[in-house]
Amino acid sequence: LLTHTYTGYPMVKEARHRVLNGDLGKIRRIYVEYPQGWLYNDCAATNKQAAWRVDPKRSGKAGCMGDIGTHAFNLAEYITGLKATEICGELQTFVPDRLLDDDGAALIRYEGGARGVLMASQIAVGCENSLKIRVFGEKGGLEWRQEEPNTLILRWPDRPAEIVRTNNGYVSGISAYNSRVPA
């Protein structure tokens, strides 16, 4: 069982609303990245969580992409409403003797012609939980970062960027409904 918790954030719901409402126009590009640095070395002997995550007998056949890449992939499909039709991926293991991938990237083709790039890494030294997505359409773009979850940035060709904050009068009903921050 896998829970995709990032789709529950109010500003993720706001991003989805803006895309599905057509605010960005037809989606052209999706960039989603999920760098973490906690597995940058061979820490399995001293870290219980690392020990099971890098052991295919306990965690399964997928390493980094199965652990965190799936969240990035889900976030892109959720926000845009687009399904991936083709994926060209590369998995890499940088830490010597590690049995599972600890880094990966993918080029993604989505229905409707949109293209995407996904990066997931657990050897990105200095990064904690840096999930970030940028979506670009014909009329505008957006950016959301998990490390600053109450902020959504909207970008336009003809006016300044907008910073949308959780539970304000200008957010969509679905975003406001999912907010637990006092107004």
Show the residue positions of the predicted features:
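Short catalytic-loop micro-motif centered on adjacent basic/acidic residues
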Residues: 1-4, 119
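Structured beta->alpha junctions
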Residues: 4-7, 124
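Alpha/beta-hydrolase-fold catalytic nucleophile elbow
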Residues: 3, 33, 136
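Residues that form or immediately flank small-molecule/cofactor binding pockets and catalytic motifs
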Residues: 35-37, 57, 91-94, 123, ...
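Glycine-rich, aromatic-lined ligand/substrate-binding cores of catalytic
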Residues: 71, 78-140, 149-150
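C-terminal glycine/acidic-rich active-site capping loop/insertion
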Residues: 49, 53, 78, 105, ...
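Predominantly a Rossmann-like dinucleotide-binding segment in NAD(P)-dependent oxidoreductases
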Residues: 6-98, 152
